[in-house]
């Protein structure tokens, strides 16, 4: 018994580890060799690259904190080799086909919030 919820329409890459009590929604893509810590929530629209580490309590691709959001199909992308530390929240884009993007080789430090429609470049540290 895994104690995880993994929607059958999600895509999880080879050699990716999901620790207990994580939630993976529909329309989620997680790359190869990732590590998803316990109590991580990944909502619809997440596109996660290879070799990404997401630490306990993080919430990825939550609906944006924007009153004009009307349920459009939007995404969050996290580039290869990035690390998302404990209790980070990342909101997806606001308008149709918009995205919140974190580049490759980034470190998003604990308790950070990445708001809707933000673009974080390559190899950056967000405090």
Predicted region positions:
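Conserved small/polar residues in nucleotide/adenosyl-binding loops
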Residues: 125-127
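Left-handed beta-helix
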Residues: 2, 7-8, 13-14, 19-20, ...
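Active-site beta->alpha loop and helix N-cap motifs at the rims of alpha/beta catalytic domains
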Residues: 67-70, 91
């Amino acid at each position: 018994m895994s104690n995880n919820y993994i929607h059958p329409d999600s895509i999880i890459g080879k050699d990716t580890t999901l620790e207990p009590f994580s939630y993976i929604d529909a329309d989620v893509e997680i790359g190869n060799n990732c590590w998803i810590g316990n109590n991580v929530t990944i909502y619809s629209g997440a596109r996660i690259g290879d070799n990404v580490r997401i630490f306990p309590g993080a919430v990825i691709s939550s609906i944006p904190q924007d009153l004009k959001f009307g349920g459009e199909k939007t995404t969050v992308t996290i580039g290869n080799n990035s690390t998302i530390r404990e209790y980070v929240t990342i909101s997806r884009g606001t308008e149709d086909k918009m995205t919140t993007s974190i580049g490759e080789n980034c470190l998003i430090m604990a308790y950070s919030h990445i708001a809707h429609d933000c673009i974080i470049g390559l190899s950056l540290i967000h405090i």
